[in-house]
Swiss-Prot record:
Sequence repeats lie at residues 16-19, 22, 28-31, 37-40, 44-47. It comes from the Eukaryota. The tetrapeptide (A-A-P-[AV]) repeats found throughout the protein are also present in many proteins constituting the protective envelope of other species. The keyword Repeat applies. Component of the cuticle of migratory locust which contains more than 100 different structural proteins. Keywords: Cuticle, Repeat. This is Cuticle protein 8. The lineage of its organism: Eukaryota, Metazoa, Ecdysozoa, Arthropoda, Hexapoda. It comes from Locusta migratoria. PANTHER family: CUTICULAR PROTEIN 76BD, ISOFORM C-RELATED, STRUCTURAL CONTITUENT OF CUTICLE. One of its GO terms (cellular component) is extracellular space.
């Protein structure tokens, strides 16, 4: 039985597979062109280049800074100087108990790093604000007693 388009219908009521499939007209391998040329050889005299060493800057600096925050009690300072391979400096800070810790240091190639620590008692301890702790009230609810 054929439908209105000329396809053969089977008992299942579906359409039949096409009778033929189209195949490519021709297969071809890729075309490779062979190019033959003489190698390009060039001879040149060696290039002489003078290498100039970059000048190394002599390391020399000095700095210092300080912080004095009376609200938080953060009080400190530092200073340092470098001349070639020798570094000298110091820093100090106020400890929570009001004392001052001072560190003096020096570093060089011959002796390495050396530090001396001094502690100076404070004239008065730094007041630290007390921590306020508030506890929430405990909620207690008793369940009714159940009788059987």
């Amino acid at each position: 039985i054929e439908d209105e388009y000329g396809n053969v219908l089977h008992a299942s009521g579906g359409y039949a597979a096409p009778a033929a499939y189209a195949a490519p007209v021709a297969y071809a391998a890729p075309v490779a062109k062979a190019v033959v040329a003489a190698p390009a050889v060039a001879y040149a005299a060696p290039v002489a280049k003078a290498v100039v060493a970059e000048p190394v800057a002599y390391p020399k600096y000095e700095f210092n800074y300080g912080v004095h925050d009376a609200h938080t009690g953060d009080i400190k300072q530092q200073s340092e100087a470098r001349d070639g391979d020798v570094v000298k400096g110091s820093y100090s800070l106020v400890e929570p108990d009001g004392s001052t810790r001072t560190v003096e240091y020096q570093a060089d190639d011959h002796n390495g790093f050396n530090a001396v620590v001094h502690r100076t008692p404070g004239t008065h301890p730094v007041a630290v604000a007390p921590v306020a702790v508030a506890h929430a009230p405990v909620a207690v609810a008793h369940a009714p007693i159940a009788y059987h």
